Each structure stands twice: as C-alpha cells, then as structure tokens.
C-alpha cells in the first residue's frame, strides 16, 4: 500500500546584519575569514530535516515496491524488491534518528512503524505505532498502519478494531485498510497457518463491512460530493 507522505516545514534561519557606517560601508574585517556567528539548528529543526529526508526515501522505496508488484519477470521482480528493502532500511535509520533528536515527534514514530512493517518486523512496528499514538491519540495514519501490522501478525480481532475506529472518523483510511484486509484474505487462502473457519468468518465480516461502507458512502462529505459531480 502506498503511504501518504507528509513533509514538515522547516523555519528559515536568517541572521540580520546592519551596514557599517552612515554611508553603507563594508563590514569590518578581522583579516582572517568570516567571523560571523553561525546559527546552530536546534534538535527539533534537525529532527524535521532528518524526517523529511526519510519521507523522500520512503517515496522511492514505495515506488520500487510498486514496480516489483507489476513485474512478471522473476529476476526483475527480485531486483525491485531488493531495491525497495534497501530504501526502507535507509528510511528507517533516518526516522529513528529523528526520534532520537525529538522523541516527541509522533510523525517520526509513525514512519518508524511503517518502515519496520515494510521490512517484516511487525512487533517492532506495533511498538512504534504505540509510541506515536501515545504522543498523538487518535492519529489516523498510525491507527491505519497499526491495522496492517495486526494483519501481518494474524491478529484479526485487533485489525477489526482498527478498522472500526477509522470508520467512525476517517472513511478514506478505513477503505484503504479494508482493501488490505481483502488482500490478506486472498494471500492466506490455503495457508496452513490460518484456520479455514477463522478465515471464512473474517472474510464474511469484511464483505459485510464493505456492503455497509457502500450503503453509507453518501452520508459522508466526500460521498455526498461525488453524487453531484
């Protein structure tokens, strides 16, 4: 699933210098290079810069992952997947560094979870999402991504809870999670690790929720708007 990337604005640091003398003369020189004090970026500013670099890395990794999904040639698919994994690993380092610089930056914790999940580290991903949601309760993207991690661990009841939370507050992300649930069902069909009875029950629940979502689409602002286009 392609993530919705969000860059954070970085304040511009400018040092104001007045002209020397009444006639706008040159600055005094000590004869030994530029002696002007340089503004040191705060840890929060460094965290934003590092976070934005991580977002760019995630965008590239997502593109490689999508390319791998489209490939029919096994060698090309493997190459694209390897490129995606390298990109996610690089992004994870950046987001982890951002959390070290600013531990209260919930966006960075959310992306730590996202990249960990993309690398298959679902338990670590859940821990990162919990940190994000502790800092920003109700943060919809973290709730959605956590739902994906629950699916990766076959924790279906918790994945359902994540969907229902999103359904009441963010139908767009709820729909994305429902799509992921359908993909999970298709991938798990015939897998020995999943009880067929449990799988069928979950599939029925997903179908039911999909029907409800379609029937109530017009009650949302986006759904109502689409009817008049």
Predicted features along the sequence, with ranges:
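Canonical tetratricopeptide repeat
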Residues: 111, 145, 179-180
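Terminal, low-structured helical/coil segments at or just beyond the last alpha-helical repeat
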Residues: 23-38, 168-229
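Helix-start (N-cap) detector for alpha-helical repeat units in TPR-like alpha-solenoids
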Residues: 40, 47, 106-107, 140-141, ...
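Conserved structural position within tetratricopeptide repeats
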Residues: 97-100, 130-134, 168
């Amino acid at each position: 699933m392609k993530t919705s990337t969000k860059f954070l604005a970085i304040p511009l640091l400018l040092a104001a210098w007045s002209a020397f003398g009444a006639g706008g003369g040159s600055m005094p020189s000590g004869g030994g290079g530029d002696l002007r004090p340089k503004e040191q970026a705060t840890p929060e500013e460094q965290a934003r810069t590092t976070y934005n670099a991580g977002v760019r890395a995630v965008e590239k990794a997502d593109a490689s992952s999508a390319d791998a999904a489209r490939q029919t040639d096994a060698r090309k698919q493997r190459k694209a997947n390897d490129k995606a994994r390298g990109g996610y690993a690089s992004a994870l380092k950046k987001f982890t560094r951002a959390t070290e610089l600013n531990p209260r930056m919930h966006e960075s914790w959310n992306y730590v979870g996202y990249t960990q999940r993309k690398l298959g580290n679902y338990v670590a991903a859940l821990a990162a999402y919990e940190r994000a949601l502790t800092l920003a309760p109700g943060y919809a993207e973290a709730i959605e991504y956590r739902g994906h991690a629950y699916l990766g661990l076959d924790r279906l009841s918790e994945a359902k809870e994540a969907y229902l939370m999103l359904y009441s507050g963010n139908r767009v992300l709820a729909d994305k999670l429902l799509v992921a649930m359908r993909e999970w069902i298709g991938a798990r069909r015939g897998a020995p690790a999943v009880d067929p009875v449990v799988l069928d029950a979950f599939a029925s629940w997903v179908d039911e929720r999909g029907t409800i979502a379609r029937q109530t689409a017009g009650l949302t602002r986006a759904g109502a708007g689409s009817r008049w286009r």
